[in-house]
């Protein structure tokens, strides 16, 4: 079976704006989540609607997929990212893991 882990990340969170970029021991929070996730899954990406998050992911060598800002949930964001990632890589997946950071 082929698995993909997708980490939905929004900058404009209502409870903790900017959470994905919050510094934790010298790294943005999203990097900590991505590094641990990529230790388990061969295919891993961050789904975001914010260029600041995408740029941070690019800086540490991760995979970021830009998604629409109009999604009502992280699951909707993951679905769009899965579609884009699958088309870009030509890979079909059997299961999607929605990783919350």
Residue locations for each model-derived region?
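Short phosphate-binding loop-to-helix
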Residues: 52-101
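Short, low-complexity, intrinsically disordered N-terminal peptides in bacterial proteins
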Residues: 1-2, 89
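N-terminal glycine-rich phosphate-binding loop and ensuing alpha1 helix
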Residues: 2-48
């Amino acid at each position: 079976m082929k698995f993909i882990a997708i980490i939905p990340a929004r900058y404009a969170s209502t409870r903790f704006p900017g959470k994905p970029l919050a510094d934790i021991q010298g790294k943005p929070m999203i990097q900590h989540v991505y590094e641990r996730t990529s230790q388990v899954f061969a295919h891993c990406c961050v789904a975001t609607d914010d260029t600041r998050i995408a740029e941070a992911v690019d800086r540490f060598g991760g995979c970021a997929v830009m998604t629409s800002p109009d999604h009502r949930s992280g699951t909707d964001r993951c679905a769009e990212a899965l579609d884009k990632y699958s088309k870009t890589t030509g890979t079909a997946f059997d299961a999607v893991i929605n990783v919350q950071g």
